[in-house]
Every structure is written in C-alpha cells, then in structure tokens.
Amino acid sequence: GILDSFKGVAKGVAKDLAGKLLDKLKCKITGC
C-alpha cells in the first residue's frame, strides 16, 4: 500500500543520508 511504499522511500533516503554522513566522518578521521 501507500504506507509501504513510503516506508521504502524513507529507508532509501535514510540510507543515502547515512552514507553521506559516514563519508564525511571518514574524511575527518583519515583525511580525503
């Protein structure tokens, strides 16, 4: 249903944001 597809989109966005945050953290720790 609509809720399920919304959950799927939210998960995708959350994954994307988490990935970007992790990349920034890695840059701070190890340098880019």
UniProtKB/Swiss-Prot annotation:
Coiled coil feature spans: none
Intrachain S-S bonds: C27-C32
Alphabetical keyword list: Amphibian defense peptide, Antibiotic, Antimicrobial, Disulfide bond, Fungicide, Secreted
Main location: secreted
InterPro entries: Antimicrobial_frog_2 (IPR012521)
Subcellular location field: Secreted
Tissue: Expressed by the skin glands.
Keyword Lipid metabolism in annotation: no
One cellular component (GO) term of this entry: extracellular region
GO process annotations (BP): defense response to bacterium; defense response to fungus; killing of cells of another organism
Cell membrane listed as a keyword: no
Main function: Antibacterial activity against Gram-positive bacterium S.aureus and Gram-negative bacterium E.coli. Weak activity against C.albicans.
Family: Belongs to the frog skin active peptide (FSAP) family. Ranatuerin subfamily.
Protein name: Ranatuerin-2La
Organism, scientific name: Rana luteiventris (Columbia spotted frog)
